[in-house]
Amino acid sequence: MHLKIDPEVRRALQGKRPVVALESTIITHGMPYPENLATARSLESQVRAGGAVPATIAVIGGVICVGLSDKELEWLAGAKNVLKLSRNDLPYAIATQKIGATTVAATMIAANLAGIRIFATGGIGGVHRGAETTFDISADLEEFARTSVAVVCAGAKAILDLPKTLEYLETRGVPVIAYGTDEFPAFWSRQSGLKAPLRLDTPAEIARFLEVKWSLNLTGGAVICNPVPAEDEIPFHEMRTFIDSAVDEAERYGIKGKAVTPYILARIVELTGGRSLRTNMALAQNNARLAAELATHLQ
């Protein structure tokens, strides 16, 4: 099945112990080296501290690897020409034996194949600005509607059109749950000015929600929005200036498709003097902690 499950992950799944999936584009496309490696290791540590087993996912040598060794993490963090994989090109990477990092969509697919129901990431993809003319909409949103894996995130990446992203998720019947807040978080910022569709206040409540959803045969995932810790956030009004500048540059330089998000994120790191990178690392760790709690309650 082109799937290789790490022995520790396999034992945990067979023993009905909690497992949390982790994506790999945050390593290869989301952060520079060596911060990417430090973050990858930290995310796995946070999951372990929460009583779950981490399963970082990537495509290596034509195989979907569910769970990476520390040596593999280190190698991936420094690898060049790594493909950024979604549903459409996951088979291509396997068939041609390429190296590929999994986006939210591809990680959900791999997690589902392995029997993992909880996945922690930084922020999800969504509807890009200007999508009414470009039709640039992340495949992540369709994956939420079809694959039964719950994703813990800090909301959608704030570089996106957040109102349209929420509308799209509603249209596709995807539950969007804000953890302990009435507001839809905006990645680097706790607030976006948008009301969250649903609110739940404990991991146990979220786990119960997921159990009910899936018991009703309502296939598809759920977006669990976990606001960045207050001490680590950059307020939305402040981030908006940096985002607008980076988005305008990307348009001016003709950057399109899968290159857009990595370019804008890297440019925002420069514009914020590294603050956005530190916030990104903090929110990812915060999401890993919540995902571990949630996975424990789902057992």
From Swiss-Prot:
Keywords: Glycosidase, Hydrolase, Lyase, Manganese, Metal-binding. Its EC number is 4.2.1.70. One of its GO terms (molecular function) is metal ion binding. Binds 1 Mn(2+) ion per subunit. Its cofactor is Mn(2+). GO terms for cellular component: cytoplasm. Substrate binds at residues 84, 104, 138-140. The active site is at residues 23, 157. Mn(2+) binds at residue 136. It holds the Pfam family Indigoidine_A. GO terms for biological process: nucleobase catabolic process. It catalyses: D-ribose 5-phosphate + uracil = psi-UMP + H2O. Coiled coil: none annotated. Belongs to the pseudouridine-5'-phosphate glycosidase family. Homotrimer. Catalyzes the reversible cleavage of pseudouridine 5'-phosphate (PsiMP) to ribose 5-phosphate and uracil. Functions biologically in the cleavage direction, as part of a pseudouridine degradation pathway. PANTHER family: CARBOHYDRATE KINASE PFKB DOMAIN-CONTAINING PROTEIN, ZGC:136858. This is Pseudouridine-5'-phosphate glycosidase. It comes from Solibacter usitatus (strain Ellin6076). The lineage of its organism: Bacteria, Pseudomonadati, Acidobacteriota, Terriglobia, Bryobacterales. The gene is psuG.
